[in-house]
């Protein structure tokens, strides 16, 4: 099992995944990222969606790279710190001797 899949599985089992997701959503809303991305989508749809041939998949493909670059560094750092904390907890739990009672 790879490290990323182990972390993914651990975060799902402990409920940390939803906490990380909630933290991300709240931080992106607080910094105005969601509004920026929504406006970007609206502008793209106005520009390219007049003939109804522009699909959701095309919109996602066009917006995703731009939206990722708009995520503030502070939000990225905060999430990385949270994930590192989780990794540290996993490592500490793995290092603890198991009770054989």
Swiss-Prot record:
Q: Which GO terms describe its biological process?
A: heterochromatin boundary formation; mRNA export from nucleus; poly(A)+ mRNA export from nucleus; positive regulation of transcription by RNA polymerase II; protein transport; transcription elongation by RNA polymerase II
What Gene Ontology terms describe where this protein resides (cellular component)?
cytoplasm; DUBm complex; nuclear periphery; nuclear pore; nucleoplasm; SAGA complex; transcription export complex 2
Gene3D superfamilies reported in the protein's UniProt record:
1.10.246.140
Protein localization = Nucleus, Nucleoplasm; Cytoplasm
Q: Mind telling me which InterPro entries this protein's record contains?
A: TF_ENY2 (IPR018783), TF_EnY2_sf (IPR038212)
* Keywords associated with the record: Activator, Chromatin regulator, Cytoplasm, mRNA transport, Nucleus, Protein transport, Transcription, Transcription regulation, Translocation, Transport
Q: Which GO terms describe its molecular function?
A: C2H2 zinc finger domain binding; chromatin insulator sequence binding; TFIID-class transcription factor complex binding; transcription coactivator activity
Q: Which Pfam families match?
A: EnY2
Function comment:
Involved in mRNA export coupled transcription activation by association with both the AMEX and the SAGA complexes. The SAGA complex is a multiprotein complex that activates transcription by remodeling chromatin and mediating histone acetylation and deubiquitination. Within the SAGA complex, participates in a subcomplex that specifically deubiquitinates histone H2B. The SAGA complex is recruited to specific gene promoters by activators, where it is required for transcription. Required for nuclear receptor-mediated transactivation.
Report the sequence similarity comment from the record: Belongs to the ENY2 family.
Subunit record text: Component of the nuclear pore complex (NPC)-associated AMEX complex (anchoring and mRNA export complex), composed of at least e(y)2 and xmas-2. Component of the SAGA transcription coactivator-HAT complexes, at least composed of Ada2b, e(y)2, Pcaf/Gcn5, Taf10 and Nipped-A/Trrap. Within the SAGA complex, e(y)2, Sgf11, and not/nonstop form an additional subcomplex of SAGA called the DUB module (deubiquitination module). Component of the THO complex, composed of at least e(y)2, HPR1, THO2, THOC5, THOC6 and THOC7. Interacts with e(y)1. Interacts with su(Hw) (via zinc fingers).
The name under which this protein is listed is Enhancer of yellow 2 transcription factor
Organism expressing this protein natively: Drosophila sechellia
